[in-house]
Curated annotation (Swiss-Prot):
GO terms for biological process: COPII-coated vesicle cargo loading; intracellular protein transport. Belongs to the SEC23/SEC24 family. SEC23 subfamily. This is Protein transport protein SEC23. It is found in: Cytoplasmic vesicle, COPII-coated vesicle membrane; Endoplasmic reticulum membrane; Golgi apparatus membrane. It comes from Dictyostelium discoideum (Social amoeba). Keywords: Cytoplasmic vesicle, Endoplasmic reticulum, ER-Golgi transport, Golgi apparatus, Membrane, Metal-binding, Protein transport, Transport, Zinc. Its main location: membrane.
Length: 750
């Protein structure tokens, strides 16, 4: 089966593309969850756009007219394939016939966009929340980036500004005579509702709205004034002792931002864009005290439950996220510090609202500047983004949705499509997404509801209905209707297994399992999750591999399953499930990105790609192992978070000798340039901007490569080592070969 075709056309990929006919068969044979990854704003030239509203089923499913509906032109009726409800076509469909069908009924139009004829809403709002406790040079770089963004934001979009240090300042941009701001203390535990009431007192209720143009003003009307304010912003004047951290009221800043937007612009698309240069040390949401002798929490302390502020801060930021969801606004965090800023505590706030999370060393580092600029990249004079969105799932009667994993929040809409079991954010068939872009991808998990052995009479269908406001203020409804086949119940058991195996998508399955493992990591011990992954893998290959009982040498996997164990091996070793070399903030960032990207990007995170460049031939993919390292070649590693160029020992010596500057060694210059060009292409396309590293063999930064590759050559290896090929990795970790041998042993045993 061509799994990529469905992704290219509809932005969806399923783990199983043939479905068993009953719940019993599914329990026995679907040893990876039945699910899919769906990208609502997937861009494809095949997507049809129409300027009229959709036609919905009058039954309980509320599904939308699609190519799989049965129509009766003489009677002007159609039958919904989801609930089998008979519906009447409205008068404007009077000309419908077998030869004259509207776009939504054409067989190839499985994804369609409706432009709803509603009044256009104001363009998205951008509220900047700026940390002024950072060093002067970084503050200058940050304000330069913000000034640059004003030229990229549509001129009719509203913008606002909040700065925070020991105090929080809300700027009244509508007052242009001079910079005017309202100051809030950073330390009292003031809640959002009290702040909203305080704002009502600042101005009468009639003036506390978007049209009043006090705190939120269109870019076209305030660009000069806001630019002058940004140019004059100074570092927080509060004196900081040498043994203290700056007083940083991050929580209060978020409270003020949330109160402003929920009061002034409720249910209008918008973003709270927070630029944070250190941990919160005062007021609600603090993650560490101002005393430098007290270190910020580590993974060890989190696991042991010995953190002082984490639980309370997490609940505080989560409540901010829930209120932002209610008012329809996303929260973005740009964490730019060598120290942790509290992403671990803030992660749920960003996830619930569908915001961005960027992790960088400083505000003048390309990881921040390039990532921030990319957010405002336009295509066809518009941002490819959606705001204030809702994703709804409709299923055939024999299929139920168990839940979703991604950056969204539940609408608590328990319809007939909702299954008994919950996976991820479950108990609902619709989810709120405050902001999404072309890469925003959601994992949906399903269960077979049919209790009979015979195949269901209706088609196996899933319909995704996504409503959102685009960056131009128009209301769009995108509908994707996906069909999959049922296994024929007349087949023998082995034929059923073969048919299921042919429909197995190992790449999508690996990503669905990775998301589920990361979701479990929020509440379960990491060793337990690793054992669960191993157990599920053994069950899967035992069911679908060819082998003789108790004979590991006879074990063989068909091509549809052959790479899946490799994915699981690298997932077990990844930063998602191994936290030894990561801080809680870094782990939160890695897991956050896994839960928002599509299949191809997620696979790069799970099993990074390695490209080899040498004089012996053109560049080619290389196995991710220690044996791929050689002294006379260059490697390009892409982990999604890092892009690394690794020069072998001989290549590094030649480069240091300046051979690439000699016209007689043009081939060597071309060899050095090739990975740089490929790396530049990756950096240009990737969001957020990854860490770019160029290193030599045996250098300190080579550790990024050695920590990623399969350690098939270690200090304990008994085989003789050719010094020109391979690299010894000093680790006790199990390598891929040993992992696969143990897998075969457990899979074939009686």
């Amino acid at each position: 089966m061509n799994f990529d075709q469905s992704e290219d056309r509809d932005g969806v990929r399923f783990s199983w593309n043939v479905w068993p006919t009953s719940r019993v068969e599914a329990t026995k044979n679907l040893l990876v969850p039945l699910g899919c990854l769906y990208t609502p704003l997937h861009q494809s030239p095949e997507i049809t756009q129409v300027p009229y509203p959709p036609l919905r089923c009058k039954g309980i499913c509320n599904a939308i007219l699609n190519p799989y509906c049965t129509i009766a032109p003489p009677y002007k009726t159609w039958v919904c394939p989801f609930c089998l409800q008979h519906n009447q076509f409205p008068p404007h469909y009077a000309g419908i016939s077998d030869l004259n069908r509207p776009a939504e009924l054409l067989p190839h139009v499985t994804t369609i966009e409706y432009q709803l004829p509603t009044a256009e809403t104001p363009l998205p709002i951008y509220l900047f929340v700026v940390d002024v406790c950072v060093p002067d040079d970084e503050l200058q770089s940050l304000t330069d980036s913000l000034t640059m963004s004003l030229s990229l934001i549509p001129e009719n979009s509203y913008v606002g500004l909040i700065t925070f240090g020991s105090m929080v300042q809300l700027y009244e941009l509508g007052f242009t005579s001079c910079p005017k701001s309202y100051v809030f203390r950073g330390d009292p535990p003031t809640n959002t509702f009290k702040i909203a009431n305080l704002m009502q007192k600042v101005g009468s209720p009639e003036t506390m709205n978007l049209q009043s143009k006090r705190f939120l003003v269109p870019v076209s009307e305030c660009e000069f004034h806001l630019t002058s304010i940004l140019e004059e912003i100074q570092k927080d004047p509060c004196r900081v002792a040498s043994d203290k951290r700056p007083l940083r009221a991050t929580g209060m800043a978020f409270s003020v931002a949330n109160a402003l937007l929920s009061t002034v612009a409720s249910n209008m698309g918008g973003r709270i864009m927070a630029f944070i240069g250190g941990p919160a040390t005062t007021g609600p949401g603090l993650v560490v005290s101002e005393d430098l002798r007290e270190p910020i929490r580590s993974h060890h302390e989190v696991i042991k439950g010995k953190t002082k502020y984490t639980s309370k801060a997490y609940q505080f930021y989560k409540s901010i996220g829930e209120r932002s969801v209610a008012s329809g606004h996303a929260i973005d965090i740009f964490s730019c510090s060598l120290d942790q800023v509290g992403l671990y505590e803030m992660r749920e706030m960003v996830k619930l609202t569908g915001g961005y999370m960027v992790l960088a060393d400083s505000f003048d580092h390309p990881m921040f500047t390039q990532s921030f600029q990319k957010i405002f990249t336009r295509e066809d004079n518009a941002f490819k983004m959606g705001y204030n969105a809702e994703v709804q799932v409709c299923t055939s009667m024999s299929l139920k949705v168990c839940g979703a994993i991604g950056h969204m929040s539940s609408r608590n809409n328990k319809t007939s499509c909702v299954g008994e079991n919950e996976i991820g954010i479950g108990g609902t068939s619709s989810w709120k997404v405050c902001a999404l872009d072309q890469n925003s991808t959601f994992a949906f998990y399903f269960e077979i509801a049919n209790t009979q052995q015979n195949a269901p009479e209706q088609l196996g269908l899933v319909q995704f209905i996504t409503s959102y406001q685009n960056s131009l203020g128009k209301q769009i409804l995108r509908v994707s209707t996906i069909r999959r086949e049922w296994v024929q119940h007349t087949m023998e058991q082995q034929q059923n297994i073969t048919m299921l195996a042919n429909g197995f998508d190992q790449e999508t399955s690996a990503v669905l399992m990775a998301r589920l493992a990361v979701f479990k990591a929020e509440t379960e011990e990491l060793p337990d999750i690793t054992r669960w992954l191993d157990k599920m893998l053994i069950k899967l290959v035992s069911k679908y591999a060819d082998y003789r009982r108790d004979d590991p040498t006879s074990f063989k996997l068909v091509s549809n399953f052959s790479i899946y164990p490799h994915f699981m091996f690298h997932l077990r070793r990844s930063s998602f499930l191994q936290v030894f070399n990561s801080s809680p903030d870094e782990s939160s960032f890695y897991r956050f990105m896994l839960n928002r990207e599509n299949v191809s990007n997620s696979l790069i995170m799970i099993q990074p790609t390695l490209e080899k460049y040498s004089f012996s031939g053109p560049p080619h993919p290389e196995v991710l192992s220690a044996s791929s390292i050689s002294i006379d070649s260059i490697l390009l590693l892409d982990t999604f978070f890092h892009v690394l160029i690794f020069h072998g020992e001989t290549i590094a010596q030649w480069r240091k000798a300046g051979y690439d500057k000699d016209p007689q060694h043009q081939n060597f210059r071309d060899l050095l340039q090739a990975p740089r060009d490929d790396a530049a292409h990756i950096l240009k396309e990737r969001f957020p901007y990854p860490r770019y590293i160029v290193c030599d063999q045996h250098s300190g930064e080579a550790r990024f490569l050695l920590a990623t590759i399969d350690p098939n050559i270690t200090h304990t290896s008994n085989t003789p080592q050719d010094p020109s090929k391979g690299e010894i990795v000093f680790t006790d970790d199990v390598n891929l070969h040993v992992f696969l041998e143990h897998l075969k042993k457990f899979a074939v045993q009686s």
